[in-house]
Amino acid sequence: MNKNIVIKSMAALAILTSVTGINAAVVEETQQIANAEKNVTQVKDTNIFPYNGVVSFKDATGFVIGKNTIITNKHVSKDYKVGDRITAHPDGDKGNGGIYKIKSISDYPGDEDISVMNIEEQAVERGPKGFNFNENVQALNFAKDAKVDDKIKVIGYPLPAQNSFKQFESTGTIKRIKDNILNFDAYIEPGNSGSPVLNSNNEVIGVVYGGIGKIGSEYNGAVYFTPQIKDFIQKHIEQ
C-alpha cells in the first residue's frame, strides 16, 4: 500500500479514536509515523549530553554555551526581562531540569537574530535543595567551521505546550552557507527558534531563527557562527 495512504488512514483513525476513546495508543503510533517521515525523534533522556545543554522558554528554545550563559534569538528574548524564568532540559516530567531566573540579556548589535542571556546559578524551583545550573547542564562547544552537505541535527522544543515540553531532535543536511546565514533541511516547527544546530560531533555551528515548516524544505534558517559572532558570544560568557 502507498505509504502516504497508510499515514492518512492512520491519521483518520486517530481522529476517530480521540472521539470514541477506543485506543489512545493508536494516536501515539500515528504521531510516531508522522515524525519518522520528518526524521524527527523524541529525546528519551534529556539528562545526557548534548541534550542537557538545551533549555526551554515558554514558547521557544535556547542552549548553554558557557557558565550561566545561554543563547537564543532576539525575537525570543524581546518577550523576556531580567527576573523571568527558563527551564533546563525539561522532558515533560515536572521534576526534571530546574527553573532559573534570567540575570541579564545582551542582544547582538548587528542584524543577526542572536541574544545572549546570563542566568542565576541556583534554581528557584525543583530539586530538594535547588539545582545548581552549571552542575545540571553541559555547555555546547563551538564547531571550527561547517560546509554544504554536512550532516546536522537540531535539538529543541517544537510546539512546547502541545508536546508537554518534551524535547525532540531532527536531522538533515546543510544546503547552503552565505555570510552569516545557514540553510538546512532538518524539519523544524514553531518552538524551535533558538535551537542549536549541531554537527556530527555535537558541536554547535549556529542557532535556528526560522523555517518553512514543510518536509524537505531547504530554506530553514539559522544564524551561522562566524568568528565575529563567536567573539561577541565569548565576551558575554560569565567568567
Swiss-Prot record:
Q: What InterPro entries does this protein map onto?
A: Peptidase_S1_PA, Peptidase_S1_PA_chymotrypsin, Peptidase_S1B, Peptidase_S1B_tx, Trypsin_dom, V8_his_AS
GO biological-process terms attached to the record: proteolysis
Question: Where is it located?
Answer: Secreted
GO cellular component terms listed in the entry, alphabetical order = extracellular region
**Keywords, sorted A to Z:** Hydrolase, Protease, Secreted, Serine protease, Signal
Grouped into one coarse class, the protein's main location is: secreted
The record's section on SUPFAM superfamilies has: Trypsin-like serine proteases
> What EC designation does it have?
3.4.21.-
Q: Kindly indicate where the leader peptide sits in this chain.
A: 1-36
Give the source's domain of life in one word.
Answer: Bacteria
The Swiss-Prot or TrEMBL record annotates one GO molecular function as: serine-type endopeptidase activity
Q: Where is the active site?
A: 75 (charge relay system), 113 (charge relay system), 193 (charge relay system)
Q: Which family does it belong to?
A: Belongs to the peptidase S1B family.
Name of protein: Serine protease SplC
Q: What is the lineage of its organism?
A: Bacteria, Bacillati, Bacillota, Bacilli, Bacillales
